[in-house]
Amino acid sequence: ALMGNHNLPVAVQEQLGRLLDQGHLSVASGAFSYDQVVRRSIKELAASGVDAITYPSGHTDKLETVVLRAMRTGINQTAMDISQHNAESMDVDVMELTAHGGARTGDGKADFTNHSWWQGKLVSLSGQPGYLTLDDIGYGDVRGFAGANCRHNWHPFWPGVSKPAYTQETLDEYNRPKFPYNGQLLTEEQADRRQRACILGLYGAVR
């Protein structure tokens, strides 16, 4: 549901979906930059009276948050789908997950909500023993791999031939607190969260 100063018509709800679809295609094709598409979408929706989105759960997000998350998620899912299609066309069953600093830690346990736990590891599309499964990484769950705001991807991996892209030392370094802020050290995840808050504020200011 869309929330503004009044109950908004279905036409405005459809506008949100249309703008996000068009924005995704514009960025994926290279016609416009990510920043250009986000700014345009936010301005058009704001002009229609939309300033926040309320989900069935009752949770409400600001317009800037919704647009940024939808664009980022859609673009990454397209890249992930291409990688999976390439693997299947080559009859490859094992995929190597990418890794990056600032991966979310979820509840801190060894489960799919903790992206820093499974990133950089190998996953079997068919569920072969000795590898992570699609369930282990939360494939298909909004909180897991390729879910909302997830920046991870995966690539075909040939056991016995391919060389792992990440060492355990590299993965550990991603999670080490090393960014100074107000007299304390932040992990990259914490620093990214603060940076995103600043970016959202800037997008809101230029509406």
Q: Model-predicted segments: where are they?
A:
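Residues that flank catalytic or metal-binding motifs in active/ligand-binding sites
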Residues: 148
